[in-house]
């Protein structure tokens, strides 16, 4: 039996350049050109880890993502992800067109869908116009 990690990359439908770059790198087992919610709702998974870096900034309400990851995975697992940090109570569409999410909002999703928050750290994620964008790094267990 050959057991190895499986890596999937979701590419939004309008991001052809991103898809081409990912193909050139040849590091992903599968490139998926589909909306993440649609994909999560049609597949059954057996993953230990779901890792989502710089993905949730393009999704405002994360309820469906949290619900589908937990309900469509055969066993418990871990969800690691980054968000742009918002100091309010929920999520917010920034001028950049990206969403930011508050820790309080993520904690509410954890309570609603049965995740345990194992790690949260505020970190600078990237520079935009010579200013750091603050983010949250999360590790959840379910």
Protein language model regions, located:
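Class I SAM-dependent methyltransferase SAM/SAH-binding core
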Residues: 1-39
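Local beta-strand N-terminus motif with an aromatic residue
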Residues: 28, 46-48
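Core SAM-dependent methyltransferase catalytic element
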Residues: 113, 124-142
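Short, glycine-/aromatic-enriched active-site segment of Class I SAM-dependent methyltransferases
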Residues: 80-99
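A short glycine-rich, Lys/Arg-flanked "PGG" loop and its adjoining helix->strand segment in the class I
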Residues: 63-78
């Amino acid at each position: 039996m050959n057991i190895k990690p499986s890596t999937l990359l979701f590419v939004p439908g309008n991001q052809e350049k991103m898809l081409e770059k990912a193909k050139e790198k040849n590091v992903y087992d599968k490139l998926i050109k589909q909306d993440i919610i649609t994909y999560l709702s049609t597949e059954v998974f057996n993953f230990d880890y779901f890792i989502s870096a710089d993905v949730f900034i393009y999704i405002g309400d994360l309820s469906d993502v949290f619900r589908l990851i937990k309900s469509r995975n055969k066993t418990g697992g871990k969800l690691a992800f980054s968000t742009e940090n918002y100091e309010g109570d929920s999520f917010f569409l920034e001028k950049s067109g990206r969403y930011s999410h508050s820790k309080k909002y993520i904690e509410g999703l954890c309570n609603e869908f049965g995740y345990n928050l194992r790690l949260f750290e505020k970190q600078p994620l990237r520079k935009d116009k010579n200013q750091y964008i603050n983010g949250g790094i999360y590790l959840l267990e379910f």
